[in-house]
Amino acid sequence: MNSLRLEPISRVAGEVNLPGSKSVSNRALLLAALARGTTRLTNLLDSDDIRHMLAALTQLGVKYKLSADKTECTVHGLGRSFAVSAPVNLFLGNAGTAMRPLCAALCLGSGEYMLGGEPRMEERPIGHLVDALREAGAHIQYLKKDGYPPLVVDAKGLWGGDVHVDGSVSSQFLTAFLMAAPMAAGDTRIHIKGELVSKPYIDITLHIMKQFGVVIEHDNYKLFYIKGNQSYVSPGDFLVEGDASSASYFLAAGAIKGKVRVTGIGKHSIQGDIHFADVLERMGARITWGDDFIEAEQGPLHGVDMDMNHIPDAAMTIAVAALFAEGPTSIRNIYNWRVKETDRLHAMATELRKLGVEVEEGHDFITVTPPTQLKHAEIDTYNDHRIAMCFSLVALSDIAVTINDPGCTSKTFPDYFDKLASVSQAV
């Protein structure tokens, strides 16, 4: 296995232009494929998850043209649901943002589709989405374990009606159903069971759907009303915002040891993860907001005790930033860390302890108490891009850190370590 040793960084300073958002890129690609008209997407993320979505769209008969640097994509929309005459086998890697929305969208049309992925994908739940789709008339069979991929969709259309989506595990189940529902034969009412996690990701979905001509009403995120028999219409040009989750590593670095500006997102961003900057500010960092940038500057950091359900991906970065704060930090209401690319709660606790950190791992929380002196460690990354990027921040201390399998960042940020080096000054 490859590893990368990061030597201590004395200071960070500079500006980072963020790659496109993974969440926005894959949602926009799917809607562009279903829409009437041609859509030009700019600042598209070039990463594994996006490549899996593009490969699937090719198999589904969608024509598109990708620029040489793969950040601009012109999609010729089908103007209808997907339809194939022969069975199609889609390999979606570990891309939840492709697996869940495609599972729902494929039910709208006709044909037989097998959806599978990497071994970890077979451990990531999809049962709550499948249950809801079946209520709306979908024909879906599991191939191995009930409630998990791989699965087969025998598409015969969705009729809508009253459906129930459990919102307590992942917001992607609701996102997937919301994007499919306007093209169902009838109107749909989606009733949310349990507490809806990661609400800001639903706001991203609703915002992008609106850009493609579909407006959805909801009653305080408990009940969603969607008119059926609608069509998505291309907005023409669609700019993908910079990835706010990816911004978190550079903003944290600035808060810990210098001053860093990220561009491509700003105070009007549709992504909830920009509120990561508010957490840094509560910890003592100095934050400046612009229309197209966020800047974080070093301040004396202190621990916090916060519910971070609204920023689950960026909250991982707080767990490592906490090593540079005075006192303990508790991150709460993050059960859905356990159903991400790996069981992130267990993985973060395990790797933090290697550094000599006192960690309490609960069912849905983690408490981190920094030691007086960190220890050098080899960090295992569990094929999880965010673990690799989070733990790179340990190099802002007076010790080196070794990241195993650094290439796993290709899921969302292939040149992350180059970008980090560009704003880093060695000790």
UniProtKB/Swiss-Prot annotation:
Pathway: Metabolic intermediate biosynthesis; chorismate biosynthesis; chorismate from D-erythrose 4-phosphate and phosphoenolpyruvate: step 6/7. InterPro entries: Enolpyruvate_Tfrase_dom, Enolpyruvate_Tfrase_sf, EPSP_synthase, EPSP_synthase_CS, RNA3'P_cycl/enolpyr_Trfase_a/b. The keyword Ribonucleoprotein does not apply. Keywords: Amino-acid biosynthesis, Aromatic amino acid biosynthesis, Cytoplasm, Transferase. Its EC number is 2.5.1.19. Phosphoenolpyruvate binds at K22, G96, R124, Q172, R344, R386, K411. It is found in: Cytoplasm. 3-phosphoshikimate binds at K22, S23, R27, S170, S171, Q172, S198, D313, N336, K340. Gene3D superfamilies: Enolpyruvate transferase domain (3.65.10.10). The active site is at D313. It is an enzyme of class 2 (transferase). GO terms for biological process: amino acid biosynthetic process; aromatic amino acid family biosynthetic process; chorismate biosynthetic process. PROSITE patterns: EPSP_SYNTHASE_1, EPSP_SYNTHASE_2. GO terms for cellular component: cytoplasm. Catalyzes the transfer of the enolpyruvyl moiety of phosphoenolpyruvate (PEP) to the 5-hydroxyl of shikimate-3-phosphate (S3P) to produce enolpyruvyl shikimate-3-phosphate and inorganic phosphate. Monomer. PANTHER family: AROM/DEHYDROQUINATE SYNTHASE (PTHR21090), PENTAFUNCTIONAL AROM POLYPEPTIDE (PTHR21090:SF5). Belongs to the EPSP synthase family. This is 3-phosphoshikimate 1-carboxyvinyltransferase. The lineage of its organism: Bacteria, Pseudomonadati, Pseudomonadota, Gammaproteobacteria, Aeromonadales.
